[in-house]
A protein has these predicted regions:
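Zinc-dependent deaminase catalytic domain
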Residues: 1-217
Length: 217
């Protein structure tokens, strides 16, 4: 399957998933992709990929500067699948500022993820290990939906992220609007809340609260 070139924004057919993007991050994506993949219906059809919108800020000497931002999707072709979280870690570890590894005690990286799905348990373990090994990195994960929230392994994966210092939360309507503003091509167009966005967000947040607050769940 040919790769979609940067700048081309194919509109997905109704009830069909768009073709995957290359592994390199893009700065923004189309509003059609956003509405298709970031709906917070608990179990939507044909949303098998995961989109990760990220922003990285570096704080040094009391001053903050942006290191980078963009959008990753799960990588499927032509190699073995690589989830969006791992694509981000590979990108982040290659950044010159991070590779220098000469961080002063007060120097921090603030990383924010807006994700269409919460991390799977395998990715959660890898991200948690990365955070434990790099205490200068502070991660906030805001997920539109929870991935297999009733399965113990996935629940434990989310708890491992919290235990490693990550802030894990469900996206609120305000978070969806912020993600639209930062990462959607047509962000100047009005963001329309879809039916059920409020109640779905509250329901998913309650489920996540139960998972994170109950180790025996």
């Amino acid at each position: 399957m040919p790769r979609q070139r940067r700048g081309l924004r194919a509109r997905p057919r109704r009830h069909s998933a768009p073709v995957p993007w290359p592994s390199n991050p893009v700065s923004r994506f189309s509003r059609h992709y956003f509405y298709f993949h970031f709906t917070n219906q608990p179990y939507p059809e044909d949303r098998k990929g995961c989109y990760l919108c990220f922003r990285v800020e570096r704080t040094q000497g009391g001053l903050s500067s942006e290191v980078g931002s963009g959008v990753f999707e799960n990588e499927f072709y032509p190699k073995e699948p690589v989830h969006a979280e791992i694509c981000f870690l590979n990108w982040f570890k290659a950044q010159p500022a991070f590779q220098a590894q000469r961080l002063a005690p007060e120097e921090k990286y603030q990383v924010t993820w807006f994700m269409s799905w919460s991390p799977c348990f395998q990715c959660a373990r890898q991200v948690a290990k990365f955070l434990r090994d790099h205490t200068s990195v502070q991660l906030s994960i805001l997920a539109a939906r929870l991935y297999y929230p009733r399965r113990p392994q996935y629940q434990q994966g989310l708890r491992s992220l919290q235990g490693a210092g990550a802030h894990v939360a469900v996206m609120t309507p305000a978070d969806f609007a912020s993600c639209w503003e930062m990462f959607v091509d047509d962000h100047k167009k009005r963001f329309w809340y879809w039916k059920g966005i409020y109640i779905n967000s509250c329901s998913l947040a309650k489920s996540l609260e139960d998972i994170l607050g109950n180790p025996e769940n």
